[in-house]
Amino acid sequence: MAQENHHQAVLNVQDLRKDLQLGEVTVQALRGVTLNVARGEFMGIIGPSGSGKSTLLGLIGGLDNPTSGKVFIDGTDITSMNERALTRIRNEKIGFVFQFFNLIPTLTALENVSLPIQFSRKRRADPGKRAKELLDMLGLGDRFHHRPTQLSGGQQQRVAIARALANDPALILCDEPTGSLDSESSDTVMSALRGVQQEMHTTVIIVTHDPNIASQLDRLVTLVDGHIASDTDPLSTAQQAAVAVLKDKRATGELKQFRGE
């Protein structure tokens, strides 16, 4: 389980709240979320559609501002930062992996991975060398000069993982990283993320609706109606039952109701 002191944790979230204004109606997307995550954890955030999973991930990643509460990354409060400082944090402390890869289509795999290195204050004599090392590590040593359209979905996602690792971030945040992939490619991507966590001791946080993905994670935080309903590692009996139900629903085609936020 994560450390209790935010100075010892790679991530500390304190009483995080987010209100969304929909016309004249105020919706409480997050209602006082508190969370500690230690370095090297491999954890997931699960819950039904509209529970606040992607909202929480966006606030952790500095992509949006909370209504109230704090987010600390490596002991630094990112909620008090201006946009310029946040941009630096996102470049150097946080890696993002999205469902639809978000690679630049006109750039090769090597160029996509090299790009964030070129914008970092951590100067490297040869950004391309670091990019090649990461792509090699992820089994893409023969795909350096391929553009995204020349790669399979699983290969594109591994390029995205390499890009996320480019500046040695404290956190990798993954929003439905296997949501657009078939089961074989999903397994490959999950193996890659697990390898990153084990070999580089990088903290990986995954938002998922997929019960098979959830069952591979070491810790699961369950959100319901914008607050944490459970936080366990390994899976509790209740969560095992929930995963089993999701598997049954997916098998009968009923899992569609759980797709999207």
What are these regions (language model features)?
Residues 7-10, 252-255:
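A short, polar/charged loop/turn motif at coil->beta-strand junctions and beta-hairpin connectors
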Residues 9-216, 222-223, 228:
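ABC family nucleotide-binding domain
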Residues 1-5:
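Pre-NBD coupling/linker segments of ABC/ABC-like ATPases
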